[in-house]
């Protein structure tokens, strides 16, 4: 029996749109980029200190490999980093990446807090007693008397061109208040 060109479609089974059977094609370049990203993540982990590593959810094998890479130099380190990248490919890296991002974010938040405290200190010295209620709103535990004394001393030092001792004391006092609040 000779089939017509349209008849060959009758022999092909219909696609039932099964998403489970669908094969997702990934290019070799994308696989390499993913592997390189995991290797970079491993490098970031190796560059962290011991205290920071304790805050990241790592299993014993991966932690041992990271600690070994921290001790190794030159070519051995490169090979160890490749091994760490390979180990990361076999694991769920999302919790590790999240913890690492939190560590980086904490550092950025601390820098941002210091900038805010410096601005507040400068405002206290420039405006004097008028800016103290702002500090008391932000930090209810603040001692008004001590703050007024520090501001007055800083203004006197600034007028006399003396070293900024009270200037630094205001900042450290504000930093203590911010740490208590957190």
From Swiss-Prot:
Subcellular location: Cytoplasm
GO molecular function, a single term: ribosome binding
InterPro entries given in the database record: DarP, DarP_sf
CDD domains: YjgA-like (cd16331)
Cross-referenced Pfam families: DarP (PF04751)
Highest taxon, organism lineage: Bacteria
GO cellular component: cytosol
The keyword Cytoplasm belongs to this UniProt entry's keyword annotation: yes
Keyword entries, A-Z: Cytoplasm, Ribosome biogenesis, RNA-binding, rRNA-binding
Assigned protein family: Belongs to the DarP family.
Described function: Member of a network of 50S ribosomal subunit biogenesis factors which assembles along the 30S-50S interface, preventing incorrect 23S rRNA structures from forming. Promotes peptidyl transferase center (PTC) maturation.
NCBIfam families in UniProt: PRK05255.1-1
Name of the protein this chain belongs to: Dual-action ribosomal maturation protein DarP
């Amino acid at each position: 029996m000779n089939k017509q060109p349209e008849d060959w479609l009758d022999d092909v089974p219909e696609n039932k749109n099964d998403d489970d059977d669908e094969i997702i094609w990934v290019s070799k370049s994308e696989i390499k980029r993913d592997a390189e990203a995991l290797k970079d993540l491993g490098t970031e982990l190796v560059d962290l200190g011991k205290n920071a590593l304790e805050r990241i959810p790592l299993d014993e094998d991966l932690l041992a490999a990271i600690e070994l890479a921290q001790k190794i130099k030159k070519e051995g380190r490169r090979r160890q980093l490749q091994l760490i990248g390979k180990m990361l490919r076999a694991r769920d890296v999302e919790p590790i990446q999240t913890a690492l991002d939190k560590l980086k974010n904490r550092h950025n938040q601390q820098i941002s807090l210091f900038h805010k405290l410096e601005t507040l200190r400068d405002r206290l010295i420039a405006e004097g007693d008028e800016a103290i209620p702002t500090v008391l709103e932000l930090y209810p535990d603040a001692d008004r008397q001590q703050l007024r004394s520090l501001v007055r001393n800083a203004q006197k030092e600034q007028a006399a061109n003396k070293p900024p001792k009270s200037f630094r004391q205001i900042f450290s006092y504000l930093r203590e208040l911010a740490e208590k609040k957190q």
